[in-house]
Amino acid sequence: MNNSINHKFHHISRAEYQELLAVSRGDAVADYIIDNVSILDLINGGEISGPIVIKGRYIAGVGAEYADAPALQRIDARGATAVPGFIDAHLHIESSMMTPVTFETATLPRGLTTVICDPHEIVNVMGEAGFAWFARCAEQARQNQYLQVSSCVPALEGCDVNGASFTLEQMLAWRDHPQVTGLAEMMDYSGVISGQNALLDKLDAFRHLTLDGHCPGLGGKELNAYITAGIENCHESYQLEEGRRKLQLGMSLMIREGSAARNLNALAPLINEFNSPQCMLCTDDRNPWEIAHEGHIDALIRRLIEQHNVPLHVAYRVASWSTARHFGLNHLGLLAPGKQADIVLLSDARKVTVQQVLVKGEPIDAQTLQAEESARLAQSAPPYGNTIARQPVSASDFALQFTPGKRYRVIDVIHNELITHSHSSVYSENGFDRDDVSFIAVLERYGQRLAPACGLLGGFGLNEGALAATVSHDSHNIVVIGRSAEEMALAVNQVIQDGGGLCVVRNGQVQSHLPLPIAGLMSTDTAQLLAEQIDALKAAARECGPLPDEPFIQMAFLSLPVIPALKLTSQGLFDGEKFAFTTLEVTE
């Protein structure tokens, strides 16, 4: 854990220090003083009464001794509870289908003042140009948008076709950027454990920063070896004892509650007063509908308090201070002298009801963020352009031949989890011996002209129609699920025509579709409009059967080979436990 003061992120000049000290001593006028407020004490528990004094971007003082201090402006908190700004320890903003600018507009008023993001979705499509755009957005953001340098592009070498590479030389060019906090999730855990030099070179190059992990279900000697390599955290844990063992071995545990992977209920019982400095909250992948209707990190805090009886100071600790310490962001995470004034005022701390947000010492106005969004997005120079180099397809492209009496592998979906099971089904003249089997295909979209890779999917709940998307981790080829080849072709051709996006087909017609013009991943619409479009897509998808809560996000992970057990990439069926390709027909 990188819990030493990292001066790379603590940008304060000597002149600012002198001004801050003068206000702290009571010799100068503060910019803001927040009165009538109680401060939640994340270290000792309980509350601290008294004003919060702000000079510039920083807190100059806290407590009753500043009751009569002068200020240019006073903020009446009306009895609110003040907590540090919330921090998401690991996410891919692209998975929200919002640009970083729009994401800030949607989440900053909810108290999310800091994000640690890995832009490997757009980097897999566009390479370094995608990372550079995220860096430009981070530089101009009010929200603290920090970047982990994407480590595995593609997720697993030789297992899929993606749009670009991201070499170690290119990665090193970004290592010293002021918004970079470390190396993003090292997904090829098998390669790390076996000591592949190319992967160890990446770890060595970023060892002075934070090294993110990714090791779902890993245990035993393999987990020990992965941690020995220097990996510091994991956001992929989905079982209680798995999380406990990782904590015992010195890993920090990121408790994830995204739109598809929902691990909070399984892992929240681990959190206690002792280990909470090693526990963090993250969303990984969360869609705009859930952000609008349920919230972001604020929703996770609320559930910790209401459903798992986590004490207030511990719940807010894992949502801020623990993450700040882990990433060496020691100017964040506490409401204390010298810390950055990222403050969330709560009218109800148990319900996480946000009354007002300040970031870098300035109050945030949601309407101003919305009004400025279009201009700020244009200023960031988004990488527009069609990234779909694929010709339209026909139903014959999805034709599969099955032999009666033979057994075939089926990717079995677990609703609200990213892992799958590998099962099999026997084919007869009447079809398969289970009625929930549909077809799945992945089509590379980067001009390689490969035939679609086809397979079978169980447990998804699709009774009719087809769903297609260009959001399919991590290479973001076209993934389609359907009950008929004709409707699969129709759905795929719609997302090709849109230049990337999502589509629902039923009764031989397109029922709903959403173009995603930036890399086939992100929309330029407002968060509100995007949430409405997602709502329409989900409504259309529900007509196709009892699908997962977030069908498109769940579908997007069916092509990710670094999460077990059975996945489908543009190259074919992949066994995520053996880290090897396998066949559709079971012959062993």
Curated annotation (Swiss-Prot):
Q: Which cofactor does it need?
A: Mn(2+)
Alphabetical list of SUPFAM superfamilies matching this protein: Composite domain of metallo-dependent hydrolases, Metallo-dependent hydrolases
What species does this protein belong to? Escherichia coli O139:H28 (strain E24377A / ETEC)
Source domain of life: Bacteria
One of this protein's Pfam families, by short name?
Adenine_deam_C
Describe the family membership recorded for this protein in Swiss-Prot or TrEMBL: Belongs to the metallo-dependent hydrolases superfamily. Adenine deaminase family.
Reaction(s) catalysed (UniProt annotation) = adenine + H2O + H(+) = hypoxanthine + NH4(+)
The GO molecular function terms of this record are: adenine deaminase activity
Q: What is its EC number?
A: 3.5.4.2
Protein's name according to its UniProt entry: Adenine deaminase
Spell out the subunit comment. Answer: Homodimer.
User: What are the alphabetically sorted keywords of the record?
Assistant: Hydrolase, Manganese
Q: Which EC class does it fall in? A: hydrolase
Q: Does the keyword Manganese apply?
A: yes
Q: Which GO terms describe its biological process?
A: adenine catabolic process
Q: Which InterPro entries match?
A: Adenine_deam, Adenine_deam_C, Amidohydro-rel, Metal-dep_hydrolase_composite, Metal_Hydrolase
